[in-house]
Curated annotation (Swiss-Prot):
Keywords: Cytoplasm, GTP-binding, Hydrolase, Magnesium, Metal-binding, Nucleotide-binding. The lineage of its organism: Bacteria, Pseudomonadati, Pseudomonadota, Betaproteobacteria, Burkholderiales. This is GTPase Obg. Mg(2+) binds at S173, T193. Gene3D superfamilies: GTP1/OBG domain, P-loop containing nucleotide triphosphate hydrolases. The keyword Ribosomal protein does not apply.
Length: 357
């Protein structure tokens, strides 16, 4: 499922160091020649395509990125040291454009690709550069050149890692709002979500995953009833499905187990591959169940639903149980990413041989 994630950043490469005016001071030499060194270049700003990242969420927390300026030149023919470079890690597929003009400047298409997005300024010349037969004691120097400064827009077509599956009003939108930066429309009537909502869940620095809230399914969705059919296909590219169930429906005549079975039935009818995808059961709205009844109600649901996979009990409204679920999701998604990016095993007998045409 593709969505566009975007972020705006300001980058500034380092200015070059200034040149130095200096003269040699040696014993018995009253007029030593010029020995002022050049300034060091400013630090560059690089971007590298990191296959372990899948969102731009970190750039929303740190917008400005500056490299160090170069050191000034010194006497005794000493040049200033170059300023330290900085490297920004971005997901593969990031498009970098000028935020002011909209012009596309760079695209990070291959893992490990490195590009220079802002070049550091050159260092200024020291007075030793201006010595000539006519001018034996020059006092000229030049300042360092300014580094490049850019306002950039980052765009990434994002594939959702996790899809939320469930009946209308199961609490999917509330869950995505509780754990991510998404703010879906939420109300107490079915089909509040009319379009897929994307949320980026940030677990830590450079640790995040993408969750998609799909409009609620009803029985008959695989044949195109309700809003289900056009969105079921969005779940096919996800790494994990969360089956969200309302454990305390307002209408007491509604059986959560029957609803859950209907969802699984639609999934199986629509696509066997989707049915076989890793799926976790998330029992929501625990805050609506008296604490003394919770264990019995969960046990009864799991038994009648004949469920043998992972079960998580949460209240999206109060966020109870959400943190352990988020951590488990990240570990699962990260493990799948590592497996997907692992290099293919090479038969040791043929290691180092060129590929045969």
């Amino acid at each position: 499922m593709k969505f566009v994630d975007e972020a705006f950043i300001d980058v500034a490469a380092g200015d070059g160091g200034n040149g130095c005016v200096s003269f040699r001071h040696e014993k018995y030499k009253e007029f030593g020649g010029p020995d002022g060194g050049d300034g060091g270049r400013g630090g560059h700003v690089f971007a590298v395509a990191d296959p372990n990242l899948n969102t731009l969420v970190d750039f929303r927390y740190s917008r400005r990125h500056e490299a160090k300026r170069g050191e000034h030149g010194k006497g005794s023919d000493m040049f200033g040291a170059a300023g330290s470079d900085i490297t920004l890690k971005m997901p593969v597929g990031t498009i970098i454009s000028d935020a002011d003009t909209g012009e596309v400047l760079f695209e990070l298409l291959t893992p490990g690709e490195v590009i220079t997005i802002a070049k550091g300024g050159d260092g200024g010349f020291g007075n030793m550069r201006f010595k000539s037969a006519i001018n034996r004691a020059p006092r000229q120097k030049t300042p360092g050149w300014p580094g490049e400064r850019r306002n950039l827009k980052l765009e990434l077509k994002v594939l959702a890692d996790v899809g939320l599956l469930g009946m209308p009003n199961a609490g999917k939108s509330t869950f995505i709002a509780a754990v991510s930066n998404a703010r879906p429309k939420i109300a107490d009537y079915p089909f509040t979500t009319l379009h897929p909502n994307l949320g980026v869940v940030r677990v830590g620095p450079e640790q995040s995953f993408v969750v998609a809230d799909i409009p609620g399914l009803i029985e008959g969705a695989s044949e195109g009833a309700g809003l289900g059919h056009q969105f079921l296909r969005h779940l096919q590219r996800t790494r994990l499905l969360l089956h969200v169930v309302d454990l305390a429906p307002f209408d007491e005549a509604v059986d959560p187990v029957a609803q859950a079975k209907a969802i699984v039935g639609e999934l199986k009818k629509y696509d066997a591959g989707l049915y076989e995808k890793p799926r976790w059961l998330v029992l929501n709205k625990l805050d609506m169940v008296p604490s003394e009844e919770r264990a019995a109600r969960v046990k009864d649901f799991v038994k009648r639903f004949k469920w043998k996979g992972p079960v998580f009990e949460i209240s999206a409204l109060t966020r109870e149980g959400c943190e352990p679920l988020v951590q488990s999701i990240f570990q699962h998604v990260h493990a799948q990413q590592l497996a997907q990016n692992a290099p293919a095993e090479v038969d040791p007998r043929f290691a180092g041989e060129p590929p045969r045409g």
